[in-house]
């Protein structure tokens, strides 16, 4: 079968999967909302305890079984075959809309290349674009074609080669923009001066004011859900990528490097976005999700004057990289599962998954015009078609799958199965004790809480 050439290829591909739009459009916002450095601290502790357990589990399952999610769980325990099917459902749902978001990013990148982007800074520009009939479909097509081409080329020639170029590029771009952000200053009409360094302080300085137990639990929950969704676990992706890892690779070291990469990018994203938004829009300007990237930031780029355009080009290129590496990993997981299921070659399955992705993505694009509806989701948000898909896959399925996986590994198969795989080549798994405790007691409880909160069922119960 196919495999990564060595540990660096695996680490960069897996980090590329983990680093997605969420690192950039959600992490800085949560940080600004949740007391800056306090959130960072909580997040770091969680990465080292909770994150490492989830990541190690998925990768080890993949490498030991050398199978994809659909077959891996069956190999672990035939009674748990259903968990493989559930896991397969996640990338199946995510693939319907991820290239649509990728298309939005592509559109903004092109806009800043061919114009100064003044239009993009006006109110209603983003809404006008996503509700138009043809444009979002065209840009989605470009993004999807690029994704499919990389997956079509295979693991070593496609995904690995591409990740080795893109990931260093992503880090470089994000670093340059972050440093630039710190040098910004702006004077308001009333004479208030704000600087990038003040914005940095607002980002990293822990704010303990008004901290209650309830507030701390909110921060903990925010950090936990951000981490969980950031690491690409419980979607079968890390199981697939794990199955491509050669036996002699040190898993312990590799998973640590993936975590460092993922957290580093999230931290740098905050250093890039928070000071820039703070300088031009003040503390009220911080938004989350698409509105941060496609509405707030174009206003910031506009306010930068002549430098706005090159910075915007660099920014949307970097966003495109983050989205592309993630979309590739989702598509690869689908293709790999289908290859295993139907025993057909990569090229055929890539075509089939490509056609499926194309049709469903067109439907998602139409969800903003022809098929527009508003649905009140159980977690209180009002969503369109894209949000509904996101809700089912992210809020409902992912925590549920993680809960079941931790029960399967912790209580049915036993943590030693995973620990043995990590120590396959005689490496010492330093955090084995922590792993045992976490996978059995902490992860199931945390995942149950996360499931209840992210689905909105918690509000219905309590």
How would you describe each model-predicted region?
Residues 3-14, 40-42, 79-92, 138-143, ...:
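Select transmembrane alpha-helical segments in multipass membrane proteins
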Residues 30-34, 67-86, 99-158, 186-221, ...:
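Inter-helical loop and helix-membrane interface segments of multi-pass membrane transporters/permeases
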Residues 1-25, 54-59, 63-75, 81-82, ...:
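Membrane-interface "cap" regions at the ends of multi-pass membrane proteins
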Residues 379-410, 430-462:
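A generic transmembrane alpha-helix motif of multi-pass inner-membrane proteins
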Residues 102-131, 242-248, 253, 257-265, ...:
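Helix-loop-helix connectors at the membrane interface of multi-pass transporters/channels
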Residues 1-4, 160, 164-324, 328, ...:
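Membrane-embedded translocation segments of transport machinery
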């Amino acid at each position: 079968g196919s495999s990564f050439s060595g540990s660096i290829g695996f680490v960069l591909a897996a980090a590329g999967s983990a680093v997605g739009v969420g690192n950039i459009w959600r992490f800085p916002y949560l940080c600004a909302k949740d007391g800056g450095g306090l959130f960072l601290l909580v997040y770091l502790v969680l990465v080292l305890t909770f994150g490492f357990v989830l990541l190690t589990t998925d990768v080890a399952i993949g490498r030991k079984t050398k199978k994809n999610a659909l077959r891996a769980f069956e190999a672990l325990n035939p009674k748990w075959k259903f968990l493989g099917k559930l896991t397969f459902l996640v990338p199946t749902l995510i693939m319907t809309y991820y290239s649509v978001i990728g298309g939005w990013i592509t559109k903004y990148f092109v806009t800043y290349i061919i114009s100064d982007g003044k239009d993009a800074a006006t109110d209603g520009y983003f809404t006008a674009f996503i509700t138009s009939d043809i444009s979002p479909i065209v840009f989605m097509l470009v993004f999807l074609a690029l994704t499919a081409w990389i997956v079509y080329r295979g693991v070593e020639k496609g995904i690995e080669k591409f990740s080795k170029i893109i990931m260093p590029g992503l880090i470089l771009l994000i670093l340059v923009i972050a440093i630039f952000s710190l040098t910004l200053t702006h004077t308001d009409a009333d004479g208030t001066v704000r600087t990038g360094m003040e914005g940095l302080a607002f980002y990293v300085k822990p704010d303990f004011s008004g901290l209650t137990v309830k507030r701390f639990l909110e921060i903990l929950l925010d950090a936990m859900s951000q981490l969980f969704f950031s690491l690409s676990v419980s979607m079968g992706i890390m199981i697939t990528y794990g199955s491509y890892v050669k036996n002699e690779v040190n898993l312990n070291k590799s998973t640590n490097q993936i975590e460092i990469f993922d957290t580093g990018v999230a931290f740098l994203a905050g250093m890039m976005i928070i000071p820039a938004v703070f300088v031009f829009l003040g503390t009220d300007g911080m938004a989350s999700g698409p509105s941060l990237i496609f509405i707030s930031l174009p206003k910031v780029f506009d306010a930068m004057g002549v430098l706005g355009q090159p910075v915007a080009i660099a920014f949307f290129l970097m966003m495109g990289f983050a989205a592309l590496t993630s979309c590739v990993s989702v598509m690869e997981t689908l293709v790999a599962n289908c290859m295993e299921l139907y025993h057909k070659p990569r090229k055929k399955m890539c075509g089939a998954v490509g056609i499926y992705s194309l049709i469903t993505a067109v439907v998602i694009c139409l969800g903003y015009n022809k098929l527009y509806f508003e649905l009140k989701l159980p977690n209180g948000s009002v969503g369109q078609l894209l949000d509904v898909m996101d809700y089912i896959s992210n809020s409902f399925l992912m925590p549920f799958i993680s809960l079941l996986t931790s029960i399967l590994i912790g209580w049915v198969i036993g943590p030693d199965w995973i620990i043995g795989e990590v120590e396959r080549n005689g490496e010492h798994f330093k955090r084995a004790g922590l792993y045992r405790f976490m996978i059995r007691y902490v992860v199931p409880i945390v995942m149950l809480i996360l499931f209840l909160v992210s689905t909105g069922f918690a509000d219905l119960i309590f």
